[in-house]
Amino acid sequence: MKTITEFQNKKVLILGLAKSGEAAARLLARLGAIVTVNDSKPFEENPAAQALLEEGIRVICGSHPLELLDEDFYCMVKNPGIRYDNPMVVCALDKAISILTEVELAYLVSEAPIIGITGSNGKTTTTTMIADVLNAGNQSALLAGNIGFPASEVAQAATAKDILVMELSSFQLLGTEQFQPHIAVITNLVPTHLDYHGSFEDYIAAKWRIQHRMTDKDYLVLNADQELVKSLAQKTKASPVFFSTKEKVDGAYLADGYLYFKEEQVMSAAELGLPGRHNIENALATIAVAKLRGISNQVISKTLSHFSGVKHRLQLVGTLNQVTFYNDSKSTNILACQKALSGFDNSRVILIAGGLDRGNEFDELVPDLVGLKKMILLGESAERMKRAADKAGVSYLDAKDVAAATKIAFEQAKPGDIILLSPANASWDMYPSFESRGDEFLAAYDALKGEA
């Protein structure tokens, strides 16, 4: 960890705990800051706040009192989930208290170079793929960021011999000023989190912060299959490297069933351990990063052929009575569902879908639904999805929850069929997270297995 004195004896406010706030509080205390943590959860229900108090860090819980900002704070470290129109954030900015992100804090202390991955879909899979390939090539890659390991915590332990492979959400990137990864990846961009950002343009602007400080000595890996993303190459100082499943590009690409990097054949697409065209995209982005890091084709091919996926992201769960189950609970939007379906023969697929109603009519999903064996629909958006199913000529059944849907799907299935949970909707109408939704699918599979 770099020794920096910027925060020594300075009063710093941590707004919102969760994993990243807790990690930031400990790091700033270690750097000599006078830390105050403010979290809305009551103290008696807040084990993280209790632990920090025991470590000598001041904690204020239960509300966000504006008068707290009357203290002379040097800066505020904001939880990524707290919006910039939050009264505490607005008041802090009015008082000229600078807002720092936890990701920026990690960058300031990290001795290790950073590879940053962002985008609307595919971030976690691509981040994990990259780390696996680098580690297989004897480069010490450490996962960090939105993938579940607070960046500021990982950065403290990292040395100059390590590499931080960091998944970055738009929430984390918004507000970064000094953050400068050596390699950055943008997997794709579709309208997401508009309730947070307000518009697609503002969402793109948040994602674009990833390259804000990059120079021509840094590399920006871009999806050339999306004209929007491809065009960003004209707007960066970084050196662009492309990936594409449709055309030969200056970077990684798919041609005649093989994955290439700059005319050098790396591996066959058929060797990839995960189905779906979107996973070819993820693999190509990984290949681009791996080749920039000097990893051999043999290591890349071997690692990607054995890569079995990430939990809740087109995760192969198992096979029961020759029926195969896939858990793609992370499919919280239409594009994710489209990409999941692209990996299968629709005539064998029973799709479990539905969730939080955000007003989508799902018309753009209709062509991808054509030919499905059946759909099992649930959640607030079920009626809208039924209209899409009708347009696609697909029959459907209702289910009260994922567990019931899984059982119904299995009753409808024949040997050789695929039961795919890919909701195309957020989970919050029925479940606290996509993880809990996916866990119910896994538990339902285990229950069916126990009955078999």
From Swiss-Prot:
Keywords: ATP-binding, Cell cycle, Cell division, Cell shape, Cell wall biogenesis/degradation, Cytoplasm, Ligase, Nucleotide-binding, Peptidoglycan synthesis. GO terms for cellular component: cytoplasm. ATP binds at G119, S120, N121, G122, K123, T124, T125. Its EC number is 6.3.2.9. GO terms for biological process: cell division; cell wall organization; peptidoglycan biosynthetic process; regulation of cell shape. Pathway: Cell wall biogenesis; peptidoglycan biosynthesis. Pfam families: Mur_ligase_C, Mur_ligase_M, MurD-like_N. GO terms for molecular function: ATP binding; UDP-N-acetylmuramoylalanine-D-glutamate ligase activity. It is found in: Cytoplasm. It catalyses: UDP-N-acetyl-alpha-D-muramoyl-L-alanine + D-glutamate + ATP = UDP-N-acetyl-alpha-D-muramoyl-L-alanyl-D-glutamate + ADP + phosphate + H(+). It comes from the Bacteria. InterPro entries: Mur-like_cat_sf (IPR036565), Mur_ligase_C (IPR004101), Mur_ligase_C_dom_sf (IPR036615), Mur_ligase_cen (IPR013221), MurD (IPR005762). SUPFAM superfamilies: MurCD N-terminal domain, MurD-like peptide ligases, catalytic domain, MurD-like peptide ligases, peptide-binding domain. Belongs to the MurCDEF family. Cell wall formation. Catalyzes the addition of glutamate to the nucleotide precursor UDP-N-acetylmuramoyl-L-alanine (UMA). PANTHER family: UDP-N-ACETYLMURAMOYLALANINE--D-GLUTAMATE LIGASE (PTHR43692:SF1). This is UDP-N-acetylmuramoylalanine--D-glutamate ligase.
